[in-house]
Amino acid sequence: MSENQQTNQKEQYNLNKLQKRLRRNVGEAIADFNMIEEGDRIMVCLSGGKDSFTMLEILRNLQQSAPINFSLVAVNLDQKQPGFPEHILPQYLDNIGVEYKIVEENTYGIVKDKIPEGKTTCSLCSRLRRGILYRTATELGATKIALGHHRDDILQTLFLNMFYGGKLKGMPPKLMSDDGKHIVIRPLAYCREKDIERFAEARQYPIIPCNLCGSQPNLQRQVIKDMLRDWDKRHPGRIETMFSAMQNVVPSHLADHALFDFKNIRHGSDVVDGGDLAFDREELPLQPAGWQPEEDDDASPITRLDVLEIK
């Protein structure tokens, strides 16, 4: 076997391993939050970035082996930004045989007209885009709207709200839309951004740049992102532990009196969540909670959507 053949075999092995991990992560998120049900029509929001391309491929992959029937329709919003390559997504979606709809709305012109030069346009643009996507979901008869936010996005939002908003609030894997008419799901909620980056690079998706609008980047989010990436490098497993903490909330040991009835704690009240034992010095595990070395990925047999339970 030549050196090139050995290299290609190794690359294919690594890609298969990475795809299995992403499939497992997505399948577990779908099962944990009952994201997809029998007969669902999922509107997959496709921006042209690595996250949405990966989400679409993994959902299509799971669709083939799922114990339930559901359909997918990809939707892209062409906001008429200068330089937007209109041909890329239709060509890609035609090639892979996915049902899709391109929605053309000049939100770029609206934003430029309303927002002074030099100011960030993201907030207004996001509101306009959300409204259009909700309308499109209704027109297409979609029962769920799938967005491509991943685990790192969720953690970044948690820290943004803590640092700048004074709230212990993240980005939920599943929610009711603000118009009360649509269920929004985030199938990549358990997926690491670095896995998505590697997968997208290996798959050579036709990525569309996200800065065509010319808006200033969200500097606060970038600071948080850099902080988390630095932690991940210096303290492997810390990111997994923090995400695990979002899934293990103890209201009685926070300070939100609207969330827990502190006022009615009196003599004779039950001990809740260990009482003050929670503050005793504990032996911490050698490895952070929720963390496993990447080499152990093949140990899990969950590679299909067979973790899903129909409710």
UniProtKB/Swiss-Prot annotation:
<keyword id="KW-0820">tRNA-binding</keyword>
<keyword id="KW-0460">Magnesium</keyword>
<comment type="pathway">
    <text>tRNA modification.</text>
</comment>
<keyword id="KW-0808">Transferase</keyword>
<dbReference type="InterPro" id="IPR011063">
    <property type="entry name" value="TilS/TtcA_N"/>
</dbReference>
<dbReference type="GO" id="GO:0005524">
    <property type="term" value="F:ATP binding"/>
</dbReference>
<protein>
    <recommendedName>
        <fullName>tRNA-cytidine(32) 2-sulfurtransferase</fullName>
        <ecNumber>2.8.1.-</ecNumber>
    </recommendedName>
</protein>
<dbReference type="GO" id="GO:0000049">
    <property type="term" value="F:tRNA binding"/>
</dbReference>
<dbReference type="InterPro" id="IPR035107">
    <property type="entry name" value="tRNA_thiolation_TtcA_Ctu1"/>
</dbReference>
<feature type="binding site">
    <location>
        <position position="213"/>
    </location>
    <ligand>
        <name>[4Fe-4S] cluster</name>
    </ligand>
</feature>
<comment type="subunit">
    <text>Homodimer.</text>
</comment>
<keyword id="KW-0963">Cytoplasm</keyword>
<keyword id="KW-0694">RNA-binding</keyword>
<keyword id="KW-0479">Metal-binding</keyword>
<keyword id="KW-0067">ATP-binding</keyword>
<keyword id="KW-0547">Nucleotide-binding</keyword>
<comment type="function">
    <text>Catalyzes the ATP-dependent 2-thiolation of cytidine in position 32 of tRNA, to form 2-thiocytidine (s(2)C32). The sulfur atoms are provided by the cysteine/cysteine desulfurase (IscS) system.</text>
</comment>
<feature type="binding site">
    <location>
        <position position="122"/>
    </location>
    <ligand>
        <name>[4Fe-4S] cluster</name>
    </ligand>
</feature>
<dbReference type="InterPro" id="IPR012089">
    <property type="entry name" value="tRNA_Cyd_32_2_STrfase"/>
</dbReference>
<feature type="short sequence motif" description="PP-loop motif">
    <location>
        <begin position="47"/>
        <end position="52"/>
    </location>
</feature>
<dbReference type="GO" id="GO:0000287">
    <property type="term" value="F:magnesium ion binding"/>
</dbReference>
<feature type="binding site">
    <location>
        <position position="125"/>
    </location>
    <ligand>
        <name>[4Fe-4S] cluster</name>
    </ligand>
</feature>
<keyword id="KW-0411">Iron-sulfur</keyword>
<dbReference type="Pfam" id="PF01171">
    <property type="entry name" value="ATP_bind_3"/>
</dbReference>
<dbReference type="InterPro" id="IPR014729">
    <property type="entry name" value="Rossmann-like_a/b/a_fold"/>
</dbReference>
<keyword id="KW-0004">4Fe-4S</keyword>
<dbReference type="GO" id="GO:0034227">
    <property type="term" value="P:tRNA thio-modification"/>
</dbReference>
<dbReference type="GO" id="GO:0016783">
    <property type="term" value="F:sulfurtransferase activity"/>
</dbReference>
<keyword id="KW-0408">Iron</keyword>
<dbReference type="GO" id="GO:0005737">
    <property type="term" value="C:cytoplasm"/>
</dbReference>
<comment type="similarity">
    <text>Belongs to the TtcA family.</text>
</comment>
<dbReference type="GO" id="GO:0051539">
    <property type="term" value="F:4 iron, 4 sulfur cluster binding"/>
</dbReference>
<keyword id="KW-0819">tRNA processing</keyword>
